[in-house]
Amino acid sequence: MTFRNCVAVDLGASSGRVMLARYERECRSLTLREIHRFNNGLHSQNGYVTWDVDSLESAIRLGLNKVCEEGIRIDSIGIDTWGVDFVLLDQQGQRVGLPVAYRDSRTNGLMAQAQQQLGKRDIYQRSGIQFLPFNTIYQLRALTEQQPELIPHIAHALLMADYFSYRLTGEMNWEYTNATTTQLVNINSDDWDESLLAWSGANKAWFGRPTHPGNVIGHWICPQGNEIPVVAVASHDTASAVIASPLSGSRAAYLSSGTWSLMGFESQTPFTNDTALAANITNEGGAEGRYRVLKNIMGLWLLQRVLQERQINDLPALIAATQALPACRFTINPNDDRFINPDEMCSEIQAACRETAQPIPESDAELARCIFDSLALLYADVLHELAQLRGEDFSQLHIVGGGCQNALLNQLCADACGIRVIAGPVEASTLGNIGIQLMTLDELNNVDDFRQVVSTTANLTTFTPNPDSEIAHYVAQIHSTRQTKELCA
């Protein structure tokens, strides 16, 4: 039997994990084992919301060392993280300034300023990326305007995954899938757009040309002295999650469900027409030259904050209590900017309901019900937008990532969207990370080949839409009201 041992470092906004994958070539089987799991979260430092990158690096090294201590010879390592955030380095590779998080308020007003000065359509035609107030382009503009004293010291800007790969190898890389989240990469050249960079205030010399997934960045020397290749995987965690989504055929959509919900489909060509711009659709880079045509949805961040504020530790019990409540009594727009990082999420949700003359969710279960129903309704709207954009309906939706363990939300999604939902795999980002490593090691041919492996090894659960459910009736009522308004317009 021929085995490969690959390690995936998967960093999310709320937690991180070091996972060991064992791939058996002859039977094409893939098993995952969690080596080390650790918390991640926002910190307050010198008036900024930041990440503790030193703690994250220590946790990564601890996990890698644990694998080596077991006597396992690692064939390769890959790192994926969330998008848009970056670390600045000087000529000696030392950090400049703080690793500020995307939920910091320093970018307030800058997106509107960019649209006014550069033109919204021109920015979109250049980048193909949706307008989000925390995109890297606005973070860099905030930095150069608010902290100009740092500029002379900056030699390099590395996105998070590239920074941690640099810390392991001493080599710098700018991986393409994550680079596209910055709104600074030109969609036609796959290189940094000089006009957008100029507006951000950043120097093009801070960046190297983006590399597509699959190159070896450098080597990590383990405690035993072995040189282990560190592979540039699809380092945006959503890009990795999509690679591991067992999509079958062109009518399959995906929903990567976690702190953020990202819903979309794969395409060989980007969508940058006026319809896509009006819907704020993004065309993020994927593996093998594919585009991830998708839309960001605020996701389970709202629930995470409610759990934290209400000190709720038993999530299954909360979901069970939530399931007993009537649907759609309280609904909000999860994508409202007010929910990006409010002082108190519970109060913000209640205020949104109060302002729209709805009942006020008071109990833990009512708040959770509000979040789940609102997400499912937004999923239905976004799926409809995506289908209209490409001119073809979807036949199934693959929900992957940690959020796919929420059976109630999966069923609500199926009912609201009127589509078959297939949930799993849970560790999609980790698996996609491993998939690129196995391709780099010449164990697999391509993404479609890897998806066949995932389909046969992952635990997948199907949810069939119930047209008689409360939320399905609610959606039908909304659509009927919309059609009436359109006829009367």
Swiss-Prot record:
Pfam families: FGGY_C, FGGY_N. GO terms for molecular function: ATP binding; glycerol kinase activity; rhamnulokinase activity. InterPro entries: ATPase_NBD, FGGY_C, FGGY_N, Rhamnulokinase. GO terms for biological process: glycerol metabolic process; rhamnose catabolic process. Coiled coil: none annotated. Disulfide bonds join 68-222, 353-370, 413-417. Its cofactor is Mg(2+). Keywords: ATP-binding, Disulfide bond, Kinase, Magnesium, Nucleotide-binding, Rhamnose metabolism, Transferase. The active site is at 237 (proton acceptor). It is an enzyme of class 2 (transferase). Gene3D superfamilies: 3.30.420.40. ATP binds at residues 13-17, 259, 304, 402. Substrate binds at residues 83, 236-238, 296. It comes from the Bacteria. Its EC number is 2.7.1.5. Monomer. Involved in the catabolism of L-rhamnose (6-deoxy-L-mannose). Catalyzes the transfer of the gamma-phosphate group from ATP to the 1-hydroxyl group of L-rhamnulose to yield L-rhamnulose 1-phosphate. This is Rhamnulokinase.
